[in-house]
């Protein structure tokens, strides 16, 4: 066995692991819980798992992702480097910290809470009542004596029945477990929180009445790449904390297919469940509790919106049938789940609500997002597009809805792009390029003066659209102009440099390559061809659309003009487009606060038709036609012109 020491560019504490001869650095890192970004799940195709060899030797051929200069400097792909001695390697920020760092939001400006406030108003206007069964009551009791020996549970039950006027009181195990201590520390003056339904009060938490904390709901959006969550006051709806972080499963692959393949290996289900629960949700929720200044026991309801595969892996359920014809998941919805069942940082007795799935590749994130978009409450035809790894689309109105997923891949969230990253600090989120000089102007996420680290989805859309507009690239995405920012490697592959090494925050060049552009063209082609096939299956075209709602966490917002220019969205009146942000998280927030919203989302799921694109005979033909800028049929995009 060899010793492998992982050091980190950001100065984090080194991790020491052991590796068997022939084991790759990526395999060793995974076993040691060292996060190295590997969107391709270690098959060598993405080039993102770069590490720097500081000491020792590894075996493995140099790949096209490592230049001669970088190879000489010690850079290796961890998936292609087999350990052959004791080694020390450095994991760069772009492969770890920038992709997985948790971030809590500043709620003081009001910008972060606007979508949630507006959602409550919109759903109420649509007839969805925003109320729930949670109540908290403050009670005082006589302290026991030698003459009054009534047990604590009976003493509490008696006063609760009188205070609430209910027929029956049930005390949860967490409540009873700490009851004796809380009663005596509080002088038998406590506040008890729980649900009141049909005359039965289910007590979930008891605390000192002089130390009040709100009853809280936890809403979570589990994306394939990014996980976002909020803590909200269950009675007022006030947002108490909001944050996000990378999905810890990312090191096992950027898309759901790679995750399913990994979970099929020995111990894979347990590894992937641990990655999402213990390595992602637990630390994120703890950070949110600290930000909100509430104890985890005060989280009394948890609502999760995620795709079908993420739901299965969250619960530790085999997801392999999802990818195998006829694509049948183990479940669409799951009732009776408690936070303690899956080790959530919350009151163990808190109900976990999973937004229902619709099909193998259209999950609860889309039903929650559809709830948010309110296309179900409109007479006119609307399109809802979620720009995530799966690329889900819903079309319809109050009379019917149809959904599909088009496997766009992780490009919209920076995956499969050589310098791609999530929309966190340092991400290039908007780009304009001068027609004559090809010099870029960049908008970067973060504080003033932030240097670029990589490029997120909205920035990728912009740079490809701008390169096409300025005639720097062809319809196939190949570079056709010469310029100081258009460079080529020894194999002739071109790249456009957004930031030279001395201009970036990492000291490395930030560029978009022809391979990146081709990858993104496939992703945008999947979106447009899915829209086209869905409408065609109903004998309709884009002329019927009156609203297009675009969701996803790919940046602060998409430049719709550029999205149309590259052929991702239909060339219709731009006033039809509305970017609605993380609609999945907003939907989970509604589920946390409203019993009626939970009923509504199940109704939406049961009434939505699922279109399986793989069975549509013309889909591949349409997809291939859409894999050009903007399309092989340029008549579909009259406004997309080159200068």
How does the language model describe each region?
Residues 28-37, 48-98:
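Iron-sulfur (Fe-S) cluster-binding segments and ferredoxin-like electron-carrier domains
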Residues 220-224, 229-257, 321-334, 368, ...:
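Glycine-rich phosphate-binding loop of actin/hexokinase-like ATP-binding domains
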Residues 397-402, 406, 540-604:
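Catalytic phosphate/nucleotide-handling subdomain of diverse soluble enzymes
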Residues 468-538:
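A contiguous, well-structured pocket-lining segment that forms one wall/lid of small-molecule binding clefts
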Residues 248-290, 416, 427-432, 519-522, ...:
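N-terminal phosphate-binding loop and adjacent alpha-helix
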Residues 70-72, 77-219, 224, 273, ...:
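Nucleotide/phosphate-binding catalytic cleft detector across ATP-hydrolyzing
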Residues 281-300, 531-546:
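Phosphate/pyrophosphate-binding loops at sites that engage ATP/ADP/AMP, CoA/4′-phosphopantetheine
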Residues 306-321, 492, 540-543, 552-571, ...:
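Short glycine/threonine-rich loop-to-helix capping motif typified by GTGT followed
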């Amino acid at each position: 066995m060899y010793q492998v020491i992982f050091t980190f560019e950001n100065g984090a504490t080194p991790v020491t692991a052991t590796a068997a001869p022939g084991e790759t650095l990526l395999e060793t890192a995974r076993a040691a819980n060292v996060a190295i970004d590997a969107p391709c799940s270690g098959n060598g195709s993405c080039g993102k798992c770069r590490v720097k060899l500081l000491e020792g030797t590894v075996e493995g051929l140099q790949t096209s992702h490592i230049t001669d200069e970088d190879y000489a400097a010690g850079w290796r792909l961890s998936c292609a480097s087999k350990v052959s001695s004791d080694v020390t390697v450095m994991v760069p920020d772009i492969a770890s910290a920038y992709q997985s760092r948790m971030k809590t939001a500043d709620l003081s400006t009001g910008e972060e809470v606007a979508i949630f406030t507006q959602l409550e108003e919109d759903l109420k206007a649509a007839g969805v009542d925003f109320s729930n069964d949670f109540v908290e009551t403050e009670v005082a009791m006589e302290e026991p004596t030698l003459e009054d020996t009534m047990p604590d549970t009976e003493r509490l039950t008696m006063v609760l029945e009188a205070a609430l006027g209910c027929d029956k009181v049930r005390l949860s195990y967490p409540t009873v477990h700490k009851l004796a201590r809380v009663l005596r520390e509080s002088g038998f003056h406590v506040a008890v929180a729980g649900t009141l339904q049909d005359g039965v009060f289910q007590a979930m938490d008891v605390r000192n009445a002089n130390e009040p904390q709100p009853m809280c709901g936890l809403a979570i959006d589990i994306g394939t790449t990014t996980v976002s969550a909020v803590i909200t006051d269950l009675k007022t709806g006030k947002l108490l904390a909001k944050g996000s972080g990378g999905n810890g499963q990312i090191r096992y692959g950027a898309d759901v297919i790679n995750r399913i393949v990994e979970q099929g290996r020995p111990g894979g289900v347990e590894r992937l469940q641990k990655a999402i629960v213990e390595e992602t949700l637990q630390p994120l929720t703890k950070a949110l509790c600290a930000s909100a200044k509430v104890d985890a026991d005060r989280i009394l309801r948890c609502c999760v919106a995620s795709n079908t595969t993420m739901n299965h892996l969250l619960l530790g359920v085999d997801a392999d049938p999802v990818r195998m014809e006829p694509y049948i998941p183990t479940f669409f919805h799951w009732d009776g789940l408690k936070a303690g069942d899956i080790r959530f940082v919350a009151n163990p007795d808190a109900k976990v609500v999973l937004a229902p799935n619709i099909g193998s590749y259209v999950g609860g994130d889309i039903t929650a997002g559809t709830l948010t978009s309110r296309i179900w409450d409109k007479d006119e035809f609307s399109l809802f597009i979620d720009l995530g790894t799966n690329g889900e689309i819903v079309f319809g109105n109050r009379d019917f809805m149809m959904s599909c997923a088009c496997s766009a891949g992780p490009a919209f969230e920076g995956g499969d792009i050589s310098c791609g990253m999530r929309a966190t600090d340092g991400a290039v989120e908007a780009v304009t390029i001068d027609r004559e000089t090809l010099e870029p102007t960049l908008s970067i996420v973060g504080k003033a003066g932030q240097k670029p680290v990589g490029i997120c989805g909205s920035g990728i859309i912009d740079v490809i659209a701008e390169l096409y507009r300025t005639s720097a690239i062809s319809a196939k995405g190949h570079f056709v102009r010469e310029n100081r920012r258009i460079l080529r490697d020894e194999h002739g592959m071109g790249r456009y440099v957004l930031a030279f090494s001395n201009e970036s925050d990492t000291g490395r060049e930030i560029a978009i390559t022809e391979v990146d552009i081709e990858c993104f063209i496939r992703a945008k082609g999947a979106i447009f061809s899915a829209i086209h096939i869905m409408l065609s299956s109903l004998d309709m075209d884009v002329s019927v659309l009156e609203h297009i709602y675009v969701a996803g966490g790919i940046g602060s917002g998409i430049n719709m003009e550029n999205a149309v220019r590259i052929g991702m969205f239909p060339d219709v009146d731009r006033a039809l487009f509305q970017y609605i942000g993380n609609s999945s998280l907003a939907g989970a927030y509604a589920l946390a606060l409203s019993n009626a919203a939970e009923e509504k989302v199940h109704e939406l799921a049961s009434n939505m038709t699922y279109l399986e694109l793989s069975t549509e005979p013309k889909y591949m033909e349409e997809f291939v036609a859409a894999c050009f800028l903007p399309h092989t049929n340029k008549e579909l995009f009259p406004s997309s012109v080159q200068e």
